[in-house]
A protein has these predicted regions:
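N-acyltransferase acceptor-side catalytic subdomain
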Residues: 1-220
Length: 220
C-alpha cells in the first residue's frame, strides 16, 4: 500500500509565498502536486480592464454579490463537471485544505446570487497584498465574470498589488491578462506579500463598485 502524506494548510501558505501552488492530477487523485510555472498569468486591476459589454452589465447590478457566505459550495461549484471538460484538478485533499485555509482566514470566496440561489463565483487565497486566484464557475452567463470584477474592485480598494491567475488562459484575455516570466513574478510577489492590505470586508459591495466609477480610470 502506498503511503499518503498529510499536508498542513500552513505548508500551502508557505508555498504561495514562494510562488508555488498545489493542484491534483484529477478529482480521483489521492494526493496533490506543486507547480511553479516558468510563465505566469497576472491580471491588472490598478485600474482593472473590463470589457465594455460587461461594464454595462456590471452597472446594472444583475446579481447579488457576497463574500465568504458559503465557501464549500463555491469550491464544489468549481469542481463540478463542465461542458468542455469532465475532470477537475480539485480532489478531496484540495477541498479539505482550502476549507481549512478559509477557516484560518486566508482563503476567500466571491459569490454571485440570483433570487437566493448561488449561480457563480470564485475563490482564492490572500496573503499580504497578493491574491492568488484559484478557480471560478458559472451556472448562469457572466456570473463568474461579474464576481471577478467585484474581486478586482475590492483588491484595488484594499491596496493589493498582485492578482495571480497562475496560468494565461483564453477566458481571461478579455480582462487584459499579462504574461510574465518567473523572475519578474517573484519580484512582484515579494513586494506584494510584504504590502499592508485588506479586503475591507466590512465595506459594502455597492461602495466598492462605486469606487470604480469615481476613479474614472477603468479601461475596456
Amino acid at each position: 500500500m502506498s503511503q499518503q502524506f498529510i499536508i498542513a494548510p500552513e505548508t500551502i501558505i508557505q508555498a504561495y509565498t514562494l510562488g508555488i501552488f498545489p493542484m491534483a492530477k484529477s478529482k480521483n487523485s489521492r494526493d496533490i502536486q506543486f507547480f511553479q510555472p516558468d510563465v505566469r498569468g497576472v491580471l491588472p486591476f490598478r485600474p482593472p480592464k473590463i470589457p465594455k459589454k460587461l461594464l454595462r452589465l456590471l452597472k446594472k447590478q444583475p446579481f447579488e454579490i457576497q463574500w465568504n457566505q458559503n465557501f464549500p459550495a463555491v469550491i464544489d461549484g468549481c469542481a463540478a463537471p463542465r461542458t468542455h471538460t469532465k475532470d477537475t484538478w480539485i480532489n478531496p485533499m484540495i477541498r479539505r485544505l482550502y476549507i481549512s485555509l478559509h477557516m484560518l482566514g486566508f482563503a476567500h470566496s466571491v459569490e454571485a446570487y440570483q433570487e437566493g440561489n448561488l449561480i457563480g463565483g470564485l475563490y482564492g487565497v490572500a496573503i499580504g497584498g497578493a491574491f492568488f486566484g484559484e478557480s471560478m464557475f458559472s451556472r448562469k452567463s457572466n456570473a463568474s465574470k461579474i464576481a471577478l470584477c467585484h474581486l478586482m474592485a475590492r483588491l484595488k480598494y484594499g491596496n493589493f498589488s498582485l492578482l495571480d491567475a497562475q496560468f494565461v488562459s483564453d477566458h481571461l484575455i478579455q480582462f487584459g491578462i499579462e504574461s510574465i516570466d518567473n523572475t519578474a513574478f517573484q519580484k512582484k510577489l515579494k513586494t506584494a506579500i510584504n504590502t499592508e492590505a485588506s479586503l475591507e470586508l466590512d465595506t459594502p459591495e455597492s461602495q466598492i463598485i462605486h469606487s470604480l466609477w469615481q476613479d474614472n480610470k477603468v479601461t475596456s
